[in-house]
Structure formats: C-alpha cells, structure tokens
C-alpha cells in the first residue's frame, strides 16, 4: 500500500444510470474481485470520513466466502486512519472498465506475515462500462482536442478547448476545469469541434454521461467527463475509426520494434 497524495486520485462524482451497472450477486462480485487479484490491479482507496487516499490491492478472498483482504502498508499512521474509518471507497479498472465498491469497517489484521485489512465482501459493486465500444487512450505526444461551446448568462458563447483522453466510436472522455464550468450528467452540447491529428476537425454533438474528479500529483483538480456522441454522422464515425486504427497500428509497430 502506498500513500496516494503524490499520485492521481479519482473520485466518482455522478453517472446517468448507476442501477444499470450495479451488481448485487455475491458470485458475480467475488468473480470481479478475484479478477482484481489475478491482474494485480491497483486500487485507489479513500477513507470515509477523513478522505485519506492510498493505493492498495486485493490480496485474498478467504474461504469463508464473506470477507475480503486488502494490502496495508508500513506507515502506521495511515494504517490507523484506515482502521478507524467507517468505510473505504475503492476504485480500480479491470479490462478497461471502471470498478467501484465500498468496504465497511476495515479491520487491521495480518496476511502472510504482512499487515493487511479485512472487511466484509461488498454487497454491491459498480461495474461502470461507460460505452460499449472499444476505448482508445489517446497518445500524449499527439493531443486530441475538442472545443465545446458553453452558453453564458449574458447570451454569449464561450468556446472551451478540452483535452480528449480516450475515444471510441461511441464517445469521448475529456478533461475540464472543476469550477465555473457547467458540466453535469445528461447535459448536451451542440456544435462541438473534435480535432484528430492528421484527419482534421469534425463537428460532433455530445451528451455528458458521467463525471469523475481527478487530482494529479501536483494537487491540481480537474474533472473527467465521459461524453456520448449524439446522432454521429457516418462520415465522422468513419474518421474516428480511421484514427483509432492508425494509432493502434503505430503502437503495434513500436511494440514489434522493441522485441
């Protein structure tokens, strides 16, 4: 386990229809938790109350079928705060799908001679597959942007330039400032301008589906907005698919070059 103060923290803010993504069956939940173990997936956990963020992993699902064990760390101060928490909000990714669940009353224990926390298996788990299309993380070296027109109270329109951090045939995720920007679930923005490297700018209409709060290692907070394309023209869809294919082809070529 490591302190998350110097890493990126992700807090789920809102989604359009959580019920669609909530799992309640203990077998399904345990399968996903086992997947986190098998993939050695890092988990961002946050204490409630207290908002102490740290990185951890699921290390075991005991045979009792009712408990989960997560990794603790060498910092006794953090471990004490975690052990005194009412619950932990845990967030991770598995197969590029965001996973979130709560652990109630984590209790300090030991597992394989290491400090750990034991808690009841969560009664529900959020498996947030925001879009049913393959999502591509955009290269940092070739920025994809989207200019979003924001109506102002005085009747003017402010065009906000956002950085696209992932893209698919179904939508995009963009980073927006956390304050003074009217972004909320189900809001729609027309006449947005999506700019793809080497392919130019295409007009799109976006609908906000969910929001996450991001905190980078420098303490700067931003919002990650997952947006769905609305009535995407075929020509725009073709351009997006060409872009995704090109980026994947280039990545594969680089990987082959390292072998």
From Swiss-Prot:
Q: Which domain of life is it from?
A: Bacteria
Kindly state which keywords UniProt assigns to this record, in alphabetical order.
Answer: Bacterial flagellum, c-di-GMP, Nucleotide-binding
* GO MF: cyclic-di-GMP binding
Q: Which Gene3D superfamilies match?
A: Electron Transport, Fmn-binding Protein, Chain A, predicted glycosyltransferase like domains
Name the Pfam families for this protein: PilZ, PilZN
Q: An example Gene Ontology cellular component term from the record?
A: bacterial-type flagellum basal body
Signal peptide span: none
Q: Which residues form the PilZ domain?
A: 129-246
InterPro entries found in the cross-reference section: PilZ_domain, Split_barrel_FMN-bd, T3SS_YcgR, T3SS_YcgR_PilZN
Member of which family? Belongs to the YcgR family.
What's the stated role of this polypeptide? Acts as a flagellar brake, regulating swimming and swarming in a bis-(3'-5') cyclic diguanylic acid (c-di-GMP)-dependent manner. Binds 1 c-di-GMP dimer per subunit. Increasing levels of c-di-GMP lead to decreased motility.
Subunit structure of this chain's protein: Monomer. Interacts with the flagellar basal bodies.
Name recorded for this polypeptide: Flagellar brake protein YcgR
Task: Give the originating organism.
Answer: Azoarcus sp. (strain BH72)
Q: Tell me the classification of the organism that encodes this protein.
A: Bacteria, Pseudomonadati, Pseudomonadota, Betaproteobacteria, Rhodocyclales
The coding gene here is ycgR
């Amino acid at each position: 386990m490591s302190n998350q103060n110097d890493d990126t923290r992700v807090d789920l803010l809102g989604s359009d229809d959580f019920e669609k993504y909530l799992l309640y069956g203990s077998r399904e939940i345990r399968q996903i938790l086992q997947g986190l173990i098998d993939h050695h997936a890092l988990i961002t956990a946050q204490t409630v109350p207290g908002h102490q963020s740290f990185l951890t992993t699921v290390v075991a699902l005991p045979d009792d079928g009712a408990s989960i064990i997560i990794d603790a760390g060498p910092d006794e101060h953090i471990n004490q705060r975690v052990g005194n928490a009412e619950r932990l909000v845990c967030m991770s990714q598995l197969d590029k799908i965001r996973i979130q669940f709560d652990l109630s009353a984590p209790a300090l224990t030991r597992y394989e001679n290491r400090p750990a926390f034991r808690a009841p298996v969560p009664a529900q788990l959020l498996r947030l597959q925001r879009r049913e299309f393959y999502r591509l993380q955009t290269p940092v070296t070739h920025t994809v942007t989207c200019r979003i027109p924001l109506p102002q109270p005085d009747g003017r329109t402010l065009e906000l330039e956002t950085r696209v951090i992932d893209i698919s045939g179904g939508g995009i995720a963009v980073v927006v400032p956390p304050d003074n920007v009217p972004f909320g679930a189900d809001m729609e923005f027309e006449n947005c301008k999506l700019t793809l490297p080497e392919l130019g700018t295409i007009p799109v209409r976006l609908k906000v589906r969910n929001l996450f709060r991001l905190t980078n290692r420098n303490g700067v907070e931003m919002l990650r907005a997952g947006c769905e394309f609305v009535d995407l023209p075929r020509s725009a869809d073709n351009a997006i698919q060409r872009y995704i294919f090109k980026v994947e082809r280039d990545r594969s070529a680089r990987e082959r070059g390292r072998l």
